[in-house]
């Protein structure tokens, strides 16, 4: 009888532990970026697939809402054949509607190097103290807008001279963070790039 009593108590303790575990583990916590909105700007053609999709995945995994903008709305094809739907045009996109703005690279991003609308969005984002990010060749958009002067920044190697001529300290690193400006050097760095944007938004 005594053994049966001890066995019954042990079962109750085990069951009690199982029912309490989810609460102790914080399973009901909201993602860290719940309520945050991020704008991803892609070229009108030939954006770099990983730089959009991997970065976007990291942001959404953390709970952020994302939107894609380009020169025109509609379906756009990347360099590797992936497609993305731009729901906003550059002319209608406003930095004030988002917590961060990300310029995606790829060969097509060069069309924004001296684009006044792209530069206006970049300048507004920085002026409003929000997170501003660019990857691959896209950091040249920020450099040409005068936003990298005196800043540590990286980019695809072809852009190193332009960044330096615009006053940036070119690091050559995969990802570089300087305050709220985040830059990365190419598709292999896209996941880390996304993670750094997540950190900056927390």
List the model feature ranges, each with a label.
Residues 1-4:
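Positively charged n-region of N-terminal signal peptides that target proteins for export
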Residues 6-13:
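Sec-dependent N-terminal signal peptides
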Residues 15-17:
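C-terminal motif of bacterial Sec signal peptides marking the signal peptidase cleavage site
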Residues 19-128, 141-145, 162-172, 176-202:
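Extended, subdomain-level signal for the structured scaffold at the beginning of enzyme domains
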Residues 135-138:
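Short, thiol/selenol-centered motifs that function as redox-active sites or metal-ligating centers
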Residues 148-157, 170-173:
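Short hydrophobic/aromatic-enriched beta-strand-loop microsegments
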């Amino acid at each position: 009888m005594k053994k049966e009593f001890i066995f019954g108590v042990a079962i109750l303790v085990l069951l009690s532990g199982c029912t309490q575990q989810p609460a102790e583990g914080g399973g009901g916590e909201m993602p860290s970026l719940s309520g945050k909105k991020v704008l991803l700007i892609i070229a009108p053609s030939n954006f770099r697939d990983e730089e959009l999709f991997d970065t976007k995945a990291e942001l959404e995994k953390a709970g952020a809402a994302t939107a894609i903008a380009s020169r025109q709305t509609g379906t756009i094809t990347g360099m590797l054949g992936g497609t993305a739907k731009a729901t906003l045009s550059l002319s209608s996109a406003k930095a004030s509607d988002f917590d961060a703005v990300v310029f995606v690279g790829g060969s097509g991003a060069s069309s924004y190097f001296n684009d006044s609308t792209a530069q206006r969005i970049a300048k507004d984002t920085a002026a409003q103290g929000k997170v501003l990010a660019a990857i691959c060749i896209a950091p040249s958009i920020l450099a040409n807008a005068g936003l990298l002067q005196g800043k540590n920044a990286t980019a695809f190697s072809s852009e190193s001279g332009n960044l330096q001529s615009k006053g940036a300290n070119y690091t050559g690193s995969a990802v570089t963070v300087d305050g709220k400006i985040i830059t990365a050097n190419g598709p292999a760095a896209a996941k880390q790039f996304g993670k750094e944007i997540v950190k900056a938004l927390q």
